[in-house]
Amino acid sequence: TSFYKSKYISIYDAIKQGAFSRFFDKDAFALYLLKKVYLGADESQLVTLGQICVEAACHDKIAKERPGVPDIRKKAFEAIMDHDFEKMLDTYTGKVKLAYMREALTGRAPADSRVIRPFEQLKRLEQAQKTEELVQAVDWFYNQMVDPTFEKRVGDLEKVLSVSTEELSGFDWQDFLEEEAAEDAYRRMQHQLADAMTSFSA
């Protein structure tokens, strides 16, 4: 768990979890993620994108409320980079996450042309006030960065959001769940995704 990497990661995740619930509708956000996974999106990459977007949207809001948060965030980011640096370099989403953390620590914007546009999108998310803005951002990131064929093959955001609860409840989520769920598997999966959103360590 993140606690064994650094207490600051765990503390920052806990602070952010409370903020995410206060400022945004975490269940609605997780439901969007669930629908996207149902339609074939890569869960791991989608979760990483969700975490980055939630981080971008929450951190300024928390810092204004609690003066000690920027220092905790800095220590958490340093610990994540120490522990997960190589792992983050393995994926495009990991590289964007790394660029975002580096800028937070050093004040330097990324020089890599492949991450400049997503990085700029993330900076804009810092002003986000609505859950819909997070949903739109993650969907844009996924379709641009992870699977540029998704929209053409499966459909746009409207198509994703139109997935019904009947469709979700009829799907076998066991392979995605961290523990067995005899019933209401899709609800458990939704809660699992919601809880994962405020964890920033890889």
Where are these regions (language model features)?
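Short, functionally important secondary-structure microenvironments
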Residues: 1-202
